[in-house]
């Protein structure tokens, strides 16, 4: 859900209809298991406190974007390796296409939880576009290699 965890089971989320609905369902599950749950709406005491919370949300998302950026680098390395080996097969193209779709899906999941615009969001989006372009280039090489063999 993208919450910031404070301590002892206390977490913060921006109030959205989706969060309220999901939290109510979670609360119901907890109560059915004879547990306790309290959902509160809070307001920061001042702008400084609010900025601390927003900074935590951004830091959490940046950590996820950093992981994604690392995986984008791995994706690029794989395409470079296949290109250097002149391994232009449809099977390899399909495998790389699946990997790119996983990266795209992961990015969308992070973006959906990026409530306050983490600093690395733009870099991650650009990096993903570069991966898409790299795969397009590799795909063209696969097509060309297969056309030459006909």
Q: How does the language model describe each region?
A:
Residues 1-80, 105, 112, 131:
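Positively charged, polar, low-complexity stretches
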Residues 18, 43-46, 50, 57, ...:
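Solvent-exposed, non-transmembrane amphipathic alpha-helical segments
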Residues 34, 41, 76-83, 87, ...:
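Long, hydrophobic, amphipathic alpha-helical segments used as structural scaffolds
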Residues 63, 67-70, 91, 98, ...:
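Alpha-helix boundary/N-cap detector
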Residues 71, 75-78, 82-86, 90-93, ...:
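Cap/lid and interdomain-hinge subdomains that line or gate substrate/regulatory clefts
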Residues 101-150:
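Glycine-rich, aromatic-bearing surface loops/beta-hairpins
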């Amino acid at each position: 859900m993208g919450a910031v965890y404070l301590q002892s089971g206390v977490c913060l989320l921006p109030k959205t209809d989706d969060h309220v609905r999901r939290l109510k369902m979670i609360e119901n599950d907890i109560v059915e298991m004879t547990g306790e749950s309290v959902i509160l709406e809070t307001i920061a005491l001042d702008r400084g406190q609010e900025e601390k919370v927003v900074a935590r949300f951004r830091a959490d998302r940046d950590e996820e974007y950093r992981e994604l950026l690392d995986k984008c680098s791995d994706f690029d390395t794989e395409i470079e390796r296949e290109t250097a080996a002149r391994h232009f097969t449809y099977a390899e193209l399909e495998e790389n296409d699946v990997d790119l779709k996983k990266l795209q899906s992961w990015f969308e999941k992070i973006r959906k939880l990026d409530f306050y615009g983490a600093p690395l969001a733009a870099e991650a989006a650009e990096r993903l576009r570069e991966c898409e372009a790299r795969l397009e280039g590799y795909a063209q090489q696969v097509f060309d290699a297969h056309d030459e063999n006909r």
